[in-house]
Amino acid sequence: VKRPMNAFMVWSQIERRKIMEQSPDMHNAEISKRLGKRWKLLKDSDKIPFIREAERLRLKHMADYPDYKYRP
């Protein structure tokens, strides 16, 4: 069972698609670096919808898998 996505992962999933459409030849490592920098520059108020979605996913995950324990 996969862990639920955090706010950054929710946001980056959307943004990664946009970057890949604009620059299909860009390497994944470069995309990840850019996403990390852009997330850090994003205002806290702009992060709120993604934080809320991550929380919703976390609660759903807890309901769907009540005995789940993260094991790396």
Curated annotation (Swiss-Prot):
SUPFAM superfamilies for this protein: HMG-box (SSF47095)
GO biological process, one term: negative regulation of transcription by RNA polymerase II
Domain of life: Eukaryota
Annotated GO MF terms: DNA-binding transcription activator activity, RNA polymerase II-specific; RNA polymerase II cis-regulatory region sequence-specific DNA binding
Record InterPro entries: HMG_box_dom, HMG_box_dom_sf, SRY-related_HMG-box_TF-like
Record keyword Zinc-finger present: no
Keyword terms of this UniProt record: DNA-binding, Nucleus
Location in the cell: Nucleus
SMART domains according to UniProt: HMG
CDD domains assigned: HMG-box_SoxC (cd22029)
Coiled-coil parts of chain: none
GO cellular component: nucleus
Gene3D superfamilies hit by this protein: High mobility group box domain
DNA-binding region: 1-69
Annotated protein name in UniProt: SRY-related protein AES4
Organism this protein belongs to: Alligator mississippiensis (American alligator)
